[in-house]
Amino acid sequence: MKTKFVQATLAVALVIGLMQSCKPKNSSDASVGDAEKAYVAPGKYDEFYNFVSGGFSGQLSVYGLPSGRLFRVIPVFSVDPEKGWGYNEETKPMLNTSHGFVPWDDLHHTEMSQTNGEVDGRWVFGNANNTPRIARIDLKTFKTAEIIELPNSGGNHSSPFITENTEYVVAGTRFSVPADYSNGDVAI
């Protein structure tokens, strides 16, 4: 009986000792280094924002840097039941193509709008890789404002490219498609 009491007492003392040894000496020890450099307090703004293509999800993600916080996932080329994207009368027509309703695509590259060659933060453009489409996402609302289908194009992988005042969004293609001169230019 005495042995069990001594063993229990030693076990409790060991646990208390371990718990005390794990505490930092002061609170500043726990928050120095690289983690502190990336910390952005609640209510404060990140210095940069990263607009990341979602690939096969067809969505655009917005992250704050340096915090790494995910601020929003914007549906672009795919339906999103959570946000109603692609289901209501306002957004469903945006997913129509000349081949019918295409409720999915591979959002690949993004490009920011520019004024005098400087990024102005009005819009983000993104290309669809599977169908020849480019989307314009409005950065005032963080919603897809427009999707256009590109004539004479297939496999729109490498674009969009923006002119210095965003007058034109230029698309690159991997496959040639015969020209359709009757439709002409597509304004943004």
Task: Outline where the language-model segments fall.
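Short, conserved, GDST-rich strand-edge loop motifs in beta-rich repeat architectures
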Residues: 36-48, 109-112, 121, 171-188
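Asp-box/WD-like beta-propeller blade repeats and closely related beta-sheet repeat scaffolds
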Residues: 139-188
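Short glycine/acidic-enriched loop and turn motifs that connect beta-strands
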Residues: 57-58, 131-132, 175-179
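Repeated scaffold domains used in trafficking and secretory/extracellular systems
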Residues: 37-39, 82-87, 103-115, 152-162
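C-terminal motif of bacterial Sec signal peptides marking the signal peptidase cleavage site
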Residues: 18-21
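Conserved beta-propeller blade signature
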Residues: 49-52, 123-126, 168-170
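Bacterial signal peptide processing site
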Residues: 23-25
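Beta-propeller domains
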Residues: 59-95, 126-151
